[in-house]
Amino acid sequence: MSVVSNTSLEHALREGANALGLDLSEAQITQLLDFLALLQKWNKVYNLTAVRDPQEMLTHHLLDSLAAVPPLRRHVARRGQGGAIHLGARLLDVGSGGGLPGVVFAICCPEVDVSCVDTVAKKAAFIQQAAGTLGLSNLHGIHARVETLAGPFDVVSCRAFAALADFTAWSRQALAPHGVWLAMKGKHPHDEIAALPADVSVFHVEQLTVPGLQAERCILWLRPVA
């Protein structure tokens, strides 16, 4: 990648972060750009994403994932004040693929310990490699089916992974007693919400605006109902 394209990507990342109200350190900006470079470098080998263009990767993957960081930070801060989530909170990102949004969460929320699980070994290996390359001691790649993980995790997240009913059913045993699910979706999934079992509740829906992306995005927060 040329110096010009590097500069262009950095400018777009900084503008996008500002538009999202994200206060990122210089180290975090560098880590995000280095992660983007890793995605580009290993994509052909690991088949991490169908997106090949660096600018499109930035918009559709990096900024799309960054849009979920402010809601996650607010949740961690709120629960931390209540004593349920604290420094070292654990997050499980399900079906993480190339590490989206899990790696982005690990970079932007260093107080959160992030585990990215995927059934494809080479994708989990890529995340583990990214953790080492980026110096992220709070990031772990796990090759497993989510149903086999015991947790407990304070937050279980996914992005374009599965229907809500499947996502919550498969990952429920990994959720801590006070834990919540964070599901990143496109359009508001009315049908998926209607199909949820009675013991799963959607307690908050947030509409997201992704800089440079003309598409609907939202986050759903869910929790088990006793």
From Swiss-Prot:
GO terms for cellular component: cytosol. It is found in: Cytoplasm. The keyword Cell membrane does not apply. Disulfide bonds: none annotated. It holds the Pfam family GidB. It catalyses: guanosine(527) in 16S rRNA + S-adenosyl-L-methionine = N(7)-methylguanosine(527) in 16S rRNA + S-adenosyl-L-homocysteine. Transmembrane segments: none annotated. S-adenosyl-L-methionine binds at G95, L100, V146, E147, R159. Keywords: Cytoplasm, Methyltransferase, rRNA processing, S-adenosyl-L-methionine, Transferase. It comes from the Bacteria. Gene3D superfamilies: Vaccinia Virus protein VP39. It is an enzyme of class 2 (transferase). InterPro entries: rRNA_ssu_MeTfrase_G, SAM-dependent_MTases_sf. Its EC number is 2.1.1.170. GO terms for molecular function: rRNA (guanine-N7-)-methyltransferase activity. NCBIfam families: rsmG_gidB. Specifically methylates the N7 position of guanine in position 527 of 16S rRNA. Belongs to the methyltransferase superfamily. RNA methyltransferase RsmG family. This is Ribosomal RNA small subunit methyltransferase G. It comes from Acidovorax ebreus (strain TPSY). The gene is rsmG.
